[in-house]
Amino acid sequence: MSEINDTPARLVSAAERLFSEGGEEATSLRAITRAARSNAAAVHYHFGGRDELLRAVLDRQLGPLNGQRVQLIDLARQRHGEPVPVVALLEAVLRPDLELLAKLRRNKVHVARFLGRAHTLPGAAVAEYVRSQNDDLARRLVPLLRQSLPDIDVADLRRRMLLVFATVVMLFATAPDPDQPGLLGTDDVDEQLVRLVAFCAAGMCAPAASDPARVPRKRKKH
């Protein structure tokens, strides 16, 4: 690989390490370029700026997940037919996250925690990246969930899926060291998936909440 073509990879690697070890707010662009043996002009040339570099760091780890989810969703459709059981859909959606988390915990636990924190960072670039990832998955997943949960409206299904992903974000943000089991109580990915899916399926399949606007208010006694 040429020096020119290697520059973006070195910048992303340096940013990933420094963001995860020292915090994204405390890490200057100058520190990143120094660690990457590069300069600010290269950041602007290859990425457009610091926020876009941060987005590239996220995409290195999170970018492949949706493709993996889609493959697993398609396998679930082939195996079960339609409607696909909610548990099978959740297994397809959540397995890639747990496998990535397990991989990062072995030698990059700080990166796992950073990926969790990053979802709460201000800035248009990160917000747009997270939104685009969620929207891409929702286009494939929501129609299948509608078949499986016909009594839940689309807006509620989307809210419930956001809560599922908020749970995943928490797992990344609180990722324990390799010698500790973490929130799911086990290091075995298959067992983690069983426990996480059981929790999330209960929320996804819960009866639709009453619309507060339609609940009659009690009249005050005078």
Question: Where are the regions a protein language model picked out?
Answer:
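An amphipathic alpha-helix adjacent to DNA-recognition modules
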Residues: 8-13, 47-70, 74, 130-131
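Helix-turn-helix
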Residues: 10, 18-52, 56-60
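Short, amphipathic alpha-helical "lid/cap" segments that border enzyme active or binding sites
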Residues: 12, 66, 87-94, 161, ...
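Hydrophobic alpha-helical connector segments
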Residues: 70-109, 161
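Amphipathic alpha-helical segments used for helix-helix packing
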Residues: 88-92, 103-131, 176-177
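Short alpha-helical scaffolding segments that buttress acidic/His motifs in well-ordered protein cores
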Residues: 93, 97, 112-119, 164-168, ...
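C-terminal peripheral helix-coil segments that are non-catalytic and often amphipathic
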Residues: 99, 103, 132-222
